[in-house]
């Protein structure tokens, strides 16, 4: 337990929090080029074939990012926007690809939560 005098002289050490998405260098998004588009299977209680892409970011880092929702048009050399956010049942996947920007198209026939999947507002039915 430090004395008041010691605290006045030195102060307390700040605890540094570790970044959950270090490859983005503190930016909210980063552009990158798809190096490889592949599928992964999730951890134990879940079963699926999840679509992921290995992306080389503009800062030189290579990350594995998740392609959200059903159906995508990504292939090798596609340019994508990457944001942080892990996928809980895919170990090592700590980033998401933003749908509806650059080469990643929005999700077809999406009606709800459209802003998350890059879909424009549909025309009103007559």
Swiss-Prot record:
GO BP: any one term: translation
Annotated region described as Disordered, given as residue ranges: 1-28, 106-126
Keyword Protein biosynthesis among record annotations: no
One function term, GO molecular function aspect: structural constituent of ribosome
Domain of life of the organism encoding this protein: Bacteria
Classification via CDD domains: Ribosomal_S12
InterPro entries in the cross-refs: NA-bd_OB-fold, Ribosomal_uS12, Ribosomal_uS12_bac
Residues with 3-methylthioaspartic acid modification: 89
PROSITE patterns xrefs: RIBOSOMAL_S12
One Gene Ontology CC term in the entry: small ribosomal subunit
Keyword check for ATP-binding: no
Protein's job: With S4 and S5 plays an important role in translational accuracy. Interacts with and stabilizes bases of the 16S rRNA that are involved in tRNA selection in the A site and with the mRNA backbone. Located at the interface of the 30S and 50S subunits, it traverses the body of the 30S subunit contacting proteins on the other side and probably holding the rRNA structure together. The combined cluster of proteins S8, S12 and S17 appears to hold together the shoulder and platform of the 30S subunit.
Quaternary structure and partners: Part of the 30S ribosomal subunit. Contacts proteins S8 and S17. May interact with IF1 in the 30S initiation complex.
Family: Belongs to the universal ribosomal protein uS12 family.
HAMAP family: Ribosomal_uS12_B (MF_00403_B)
Protein's recorded name: Small ribosomal subunit protein uS12
Organism for this UniProt entry: Opitutus terrae (strain DSM 11246 / JCM 15787 / PB90-1)
């Amino acid at each position: 337990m430090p004395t008041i005098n010691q605290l006045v002289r030195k102060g307390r050490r700040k605890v540094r929090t570790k970044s959950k998405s270090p490859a983005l260098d503190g930016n909210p998004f980063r552009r990158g080029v798809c190096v490889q588009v592949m599928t992964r299977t999730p951890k134990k209680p879940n079963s699926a074939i999840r679509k992921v892409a290995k992306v080389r970011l503009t800062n030189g880092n290579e990350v594995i990012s998740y392609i959200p929702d059903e159906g995508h048009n990504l292939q090798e050399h596609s340019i994508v926007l990457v944001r942080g956010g892990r996928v809980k049942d895919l170990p090592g996947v700590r980033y998401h690809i933003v749908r509806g920007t650059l080469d990643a198209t929005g999700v077809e026939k999406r009606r709800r939560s459209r802003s998350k999947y890059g879909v424009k507002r549909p025309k009103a039915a007559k």
